[in-house]
Amino acid sequence: MTTATESEAPRIHKGLAGVVVDTTAISKVVPETNSLTYRGYPVQDLAAQCSFEQVAYLLWHGELPTDQLALFSQRERASRRIDRSMQALLAKLPDNCHPMDVVRTAISYLGAEDLEEDVDTAEANYAKSLRMFAVLPTIVATDIRRRQGLTPIPPHSQLGYAQNFLNMCFGEVPEPVVVRAFEQSMVLYAEHSFNASTFAARVVTSTQSDIYSAVTAAIGALKGSLHGGANEAVMHDMLEIGSAEKAPEWLHGKLSRKEKVMGFGHRVYKNGDSRVPTMKVALEQVAQVRDGQRWLDIYNTLESAMFAATRIKPNLDFPTGPAYYLMDFPIESFTPLFVMSRITGWTAHIMEQAASNALIRPLSEYSGQPQRSLV
C-alpha cells in the first residue's frame, strides 16, 4: 500500500530559497526591515564608527576590541609581507588572467606552503585567518601594479589597513575622505550571513577539509557575476551609458530585452539594501574630491529610472562600483577588493562551522529516465 508521504512529490527549493540550514551567531539579515547586523551591531553604525580592523576582530571574537586592538593590529601588521616564492608565483601568472584567478591561486599556494595546512584547531584556524587577512592586500596590490608594469610597493607597518593598501597600490596615501570611503566599503562587504560564497566555504569545511580549500571555494563562488562580480559589471554599464541623459534610454533597452540590470535587486532584500545609504554618501564624498559628478549624475538618474520602471532598488554593488572607479582602481580589481573584505566573514563562518560540524549533504529529486535495461 502506498502511503500519502510516498506518493507526494517532495517540495523543491531551487537555490535553497527560504531554506534555513543552520544557525549562526555571526550576522543577522532581516529582510522585513532590510537590516543587517554583525554580532548584534547594525552594519551602518560599524561603518560610521569603526575601523576595518575593529570589525574583523568583532567578526572573529564576537566582541569589539578594547585593549586587545593594539596586539591584534601588531600581529596583522607583522604578517603583511609575502615571501620570494609568492612574489615569483605572482610574476609568472599570465597577464590576461582575471585578477580573481590570481587571488584564488595565491590562497591555494599559501595552503601548499603551510606545513600545518591540515591542523584545524580553533587556534590554528584563527592564526591562518589573520594571516590571510593581512597578506591579501599585499597580493592584490602586487597584482594591480604588475598589470600596470609597475614595481610592487612593500607594506608599511606604520600605516593602518586601509592606508597601507592604498599606499601599496598608488605609491601614496590618498585624501582622507578616500581612505575613509574605502574602509567603509570594506566594513559593508565584510559579512552577509549564508550568501553563496560563504555557504560554499561552509560546505567545504563540513567535509573536514582545510581552511585554505574552503576559502578557495568561496573565491570561486564570489567570482560569479551574480555574486561578487556585480560591482565590476555596474561600472562597465556606467561607462557604456556615458552620461546621465542617456541613462533612461539605455535602461529601457535593457528592460525591453529582459536583460538583468546589474547592481539592482537582491536575493534577500526586497525593499532596499540597508548598506546602500552609507556607501552612497561615501560615493558622494569621493566624487567631490575626485571630479566625479558625471558618475554621480548617472547613478542618480539610473536609480530613479529603475525604481520608476520596476520598483527595484539598488544593492551595495551599485554605489561601490563608481566609488572604486573614482579611487582609481582598475575595474577588474573590484572583486578582489571584495575578497579582501569578505575574508573576515568567510573565515568566521569556517571557524563556526568547524566548531559545531555536520556534513552538509542535501538531497535531490531525480528527473531523468526511469530505470531501464541495457538489452
Curated annotation (Swiss-Prot):
It catalyses: oxaloacetate + acetyl-CoA + H2O = citrate + CoA + H(+). GO terms for biological process: carbohydrate metabolic process; tricarboxylic acid cycle. The gene is gltA. InterPro entries: 2-MeCitrate/Citrate_synth_II (IPR011278), Citrate_synth-like_lrg_a-sub (IPR016142), Citrate_synth-like_sm_a-sub (IPR016143), Citrate_synthase (IPR002020), Citrate_synthase_AS (IPR019810), Citrate_synthase_bac-typ (IPR024176), Citrate_synthase_sf (IPR036969). Belongs to the citrate synthase family. This is Citrate synthase. Pathway: Carbohydrate metabolism; tricarboxylic acid cycle; isocitrate from oxaloacetate: step 1/2. Homohexamer. GO terms for molecular function: citrate (Si)-synthase activity. Allosterically inhibited by NADH.
